Structures are given as structure tokens and as C-alpha cells.
């Protein structure tokens, strides 16, 4: 029986996980395998092949991004480590664009089930641009409801109507939609991806700067807690309680890098940059006082 449930909440993610019962410290709450893995083999394919996407324009952009990322990394390594513990912003922007290209290409080859799970997650960025791969949701009119859940491409922006021109697959019909009804495939990936990939349940946990859970790979868990847990599938991760959790309490995760944990302003800056929200967790609010 599940120890938690998913509820709608006010906030950037719109949903959250809540304990259905008292959960003791160190209890395993979730065991989950990513429905989409962004592993090293995947990265090598795009980094090492001359034409990884088969699209000359995208392949040229990938090669250019690789060069620029290398330059940014060299600049960062030459700095005093006390200058900035986080990844340089100029490199992060380039990596985000690289992730957008790769995630969209991978999405197109995934099963319908994986695509539906992908687009069910939150998009904090909604960086809708021409030829961006998107999902449609939240339409309430009788005609609009027929488009909910469809995968489409943005073909431009109609300034007179203040709507995006959207072309649905496989039907070439074009419709005009508001930004609030669009999710970008790459934006969902950037908003939810962990090292192991995208998770259907784990990605619905909201952030706290003092979270009550932590997620580990099975080998990490066994080493840290001297256990002999056997993974059900490769890349399986487990989420455990870091403290005693009361029934009805929200389960929270830590979204940002360890180096950002020094003070509230640094944490909030990284959360704004990566996830587009202002953290109002209890830990941050107490630190402001």
C-alpha cells in the first residue's frame, strides 16, 4: 500500500506528494525507475558522432555548442574556486540549449506511453520558440478539448491575436493558442530531470531547502546504510525519509546544487534561474528574520 498520495496544491508545480500515514525516519517511501534515461551512452552519441540527429542545421548547432561549452569550462577552471562554487551561467545557458536539442530528438522516438508521462510533468520554462516541439493542455472549450494531450510544433507567433501558431501532428491543421496552454518538451526535461532521467512520481515532489526526504541510487543506499537491497531494474532509485514524517505532511526534495546552500539569497537565485520560482519554504523564511 502506498505511503503517500498526489494532491493538487498552490505553487509552481501544481501538485505535491503527501504522507497518508506516519512515516519513520529512514523508511523507504518510493522505489522507482526513470521512464526516460539520459545516460552517458546517450550523451556520447550526440558528442562523438558527426551527424547525431541527421538534421544538418541541428548537427552544426551541436558542434558549435560543444566548442562554446569547452571555452566556458576552461574560463571557469581558471577562476579561484572561492569566486563561485556553482557552474558558470554562460555554460549553463549553452548546456540548456544542448539539452533542448537532445531531449526533443529523443522524445520523438519514444513510445506514446513515455511521451504522455513526459508531458504530464510541469514545465517551469515554457520557452516556446519557432519549431519548438510542444504538448497542448488545459483547453476548456468543446473544440479545444479535442487538442488536449496532442503533440505539436510551434510555427510562429501571431502578434495581432497574441497567440502562438501551433501545428498538430499528424494533422497539419494550425490553431492559435495561448502560451499558458503549451508545454515544451525541452522545458519539461529541464524542469524535472535528475542525473538518472525523468521519473513519473519522484518528479512531482516540491522543493524545500530543508527537505524531509532524500533520493539515492540502490548502490548509494546500500553503501551509505550498509544494506543489501537488490535493484528491480537498472537505474532504480529509492526515496527515503530523512526524518519522522507525520500523516498529512508534504514530502519534499532538494532541487539545487550543494554549493548553493550557504544562504537564502544564493539558494533563491539558483531556484529562480533553474525553476522560475521564489522559494518561500519555512527554512528560507526563518533565515530572512
Give, region by region, the residue ranges found by the protein language model.
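Conserved catalytic SET/PR domain of SAM-dependent protein methyltransferases, capturing the structural core
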Residues: 1-153, 161, 168-174, 179-289
Amino acid at each position: 500500500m502506498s505511503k503517500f498520495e498526489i494532491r493538487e496544491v498552490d505553487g509552481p508545480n501544481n501538485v505535491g506528494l503527501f504522507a497518508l500515514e506516519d512515516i519513520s525516519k529512514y523508511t523507504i517511501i518510493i522505489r522507482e525507475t526513470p521512464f526516460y534515461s539520459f545516460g552517458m551512452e546517450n550523451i556520447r552519441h550526440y558528442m562523438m558522432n558527426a551527424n547525431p540527429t541527421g538534421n544538418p542545421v541541428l548537427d552544426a548547432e551541436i558542434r558549435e555548442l560543444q566548442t562554446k561549452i569547452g571555452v566556458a569550462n576552461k574560463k571557469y577552471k581558471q577562476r579561484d574556486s572561492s569566486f563561485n562554487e556553482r557552474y558558470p551561467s554562460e555554460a549553463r545557458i549553452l548546456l540548456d540549449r544542448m539539452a533542448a536539442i537532445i531531449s526533443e530528438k529523443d522524445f520523438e522516438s519514444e513510445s506514446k506511453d513515455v511521451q504522455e508521462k513526459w508531458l504530464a510533468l510541469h514545465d517551469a520554462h515554457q520557452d516556446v520558440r519557432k519549431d519548438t516541439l510542444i504538448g497542448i493542455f488545459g483547453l476548456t472549450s468543446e473544440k479545444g478539448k479535442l487538442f488536449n494531450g496532442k503533440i505539436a510544433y510551434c510555427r510562429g507567433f501571431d502578434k495581432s491575436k497574441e497567440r502562438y501558431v501551433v501545428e498538430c501532428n499528424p494533422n497539419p491543421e494550425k490553431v492559435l493558442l495561448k502560451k499558458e496552454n503549451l508545454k515544451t518538451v525541452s522545458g519539461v526535461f529541464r524542469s524535472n530531470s535528475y542525473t538518472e532521467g525523468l521519473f513519473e512520481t519522484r518528479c512531482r515532489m516540491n522543493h524545500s531547502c530543508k527537505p524531509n526526504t532524500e533520493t539515492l541510487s540502490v548502490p548509494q543506499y546500500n553503501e551509505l546504510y550498509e544494506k543489501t537491497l537488490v535493484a528491480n531494474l537498472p537505474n532504480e532509485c529509492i526515496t527515503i525519509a530523512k526524518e519522522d514524517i507525520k500523516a498529512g505532511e508534504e514530502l519534499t526534495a532538494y532541487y539545487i546544487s550543494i554549493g548553493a546552500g550557504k544562504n537564502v539569497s544564493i539558494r533563491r537565485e539558483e531556484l529562480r534561474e533553474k525553476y522560475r520560482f521564489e522559494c518561500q519554504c519555512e527554512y528560507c523564511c526563518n533565515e530572512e528574520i
